[in-house]
Amino acid sequence: MPFRRFPLVLATTAVIASVSACAVSASTGSASTGSAGTGSAGQGQDPPVSSASAPPAAASASAITLVVPPGEGGGALSTPRTLTMPAGWTARVWARLPDARMEAWTPEGDLLVSEPNDGRIMELRPDATGTATVTTVLSGLTSPQGMAFARLNGGWVLYVAETDQIDRYPWGSGGIGGARTVIAARLPDQDPSGDDVHRMKDVTVAADGTVYFNVGSSSNANPDDRTMSPQRAVIMAVRPDGTDLRVVERGVRNGEGLAVAPNGSVWTAVNERDNIPYPTHAPYSTYSDAYGQVIRAYVNNHPPDEVAQVTAGRDLGWPYCDPDQDDSHPAGSLANVPLVPNSATNPGGTAMNCAKLAPVEVGLPAHSAPLGMTFLEGSKVPGRWSGGAVVAVHGSWDRQQPQAPAVSWLAWDSAKGTMTPSVTLVGGFENADGTFWGRPVDAVPGPDGALYVSDDAAGAIYRLVPAG
């Protein structure tokens, strides 16, 4: 069966009792945002700078007080905080971790959280107080981030994505059951200049046991990444025993979110480029011909970040082709977004024919910086929410005004095997002055039907309980 980042109740798994995590700035890639629906190319418009481009809020959104138990305050949580969520939901600080990144539930029902800055994997076990007891499971790793549990040869294994390799650990009796096996080694985590842009990695496991992971670009928009050895800006796959290591999808600038859909397909959430030049010969803002110009009003809203299916041989086009929600498309639509030539790296389509590339299934507002992604089917999250995926949006740096951090929700269309544009499920992580007090990194459903959200800015794990 496909991998899930929430517990699977199998005959071999104990019954799970009901229970009441940018510190790593290099990992965010694109971290700016904007309105994906304004500034149609070629119309000479100069869109207003605002946050109106954020996905619409979920129906009946309400301001919900974030409950901070005694001893769990401090830092960003010294001030009372309010989250925007569907009416009837509740929110509580479940644990404090200074560098909380990706999450994965153990077969026994405990939550693993990665702390890349400290090289650790932490285990959070529910306690009687409604919070969690925190212990160290692994340490001394190289910036570990993504994690995935899967069945192998009749037992459980834990995959961990370090920046330079993918590890497999046997899991037994509620913990690491033996020595690690490196199944993909010497992965690129620095560019030739020694920079560490987009070095963080995620990992997921398909139904057939194939292990998928991302290798981000070393730059914002340097074509050399496509010819480096090993390649950058790709999604790779490997068998559990470390054989058949291969590139599956190219042109993926920073596909740091990976997840398996209900139909078994693999999907990635991608941080797209910053400072995009205007793509067409047309008036825009104060320019009579804006082609190739880097214009703040345009950059604010372009290009959209991507949620795309991982398909063998597919190319998302980076850095030659950019998703453009305005080109030959209903302005502002973020479904089936076409790819168009970048005026700096691919003028006139001389380096790559973007029209031959499949459109991006779903766009997110520009510079959202999506990170962890999880499909909720099969979880205990109630109602309509189980019929979609959640994506943790880390928020922007390259936009006036910044795109706010959030947890977005995308409905899964089972008939078409795709997703629909996002709505904001959880918001409210920004201060009145537009700065961020919190930045979600991951969101996973727990065995109790709650949603557990990691936040590496506030250093916390939130337990969000849906109504009903």
Q: Where do the language-model regions lie?
A:
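Asp-box/WD-like beta-propeller blade repeats and closely related beta-sheet repeat scaffolds
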Residues: S143, D164-A206, S217-N220
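Bacterial signal peptide processing site
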Residues: A23-S25
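C-terminal motif of bacterial Sec signal peptides marking the signal peptidase cleavage site
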Residues: S18-A21
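Blade-level signature of beta-propeller repeat domains, shared across WD40, Kelch, NHL, RCC1
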Residues: V444-G468
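Beta-rich, blade/repeat-based domains predominating
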Residues: L97-E108, S139-V157, A161, D189-T210, ...
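Beta-propeller domain segments
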Residues: A54-T84, S218-N220, V238-D241, R253, ...
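Blade-edge beta-strand/turn elements of extracellular beta-propeller
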Residues: S78-P80, T84-R96, D127-G140, W171-S193, ...
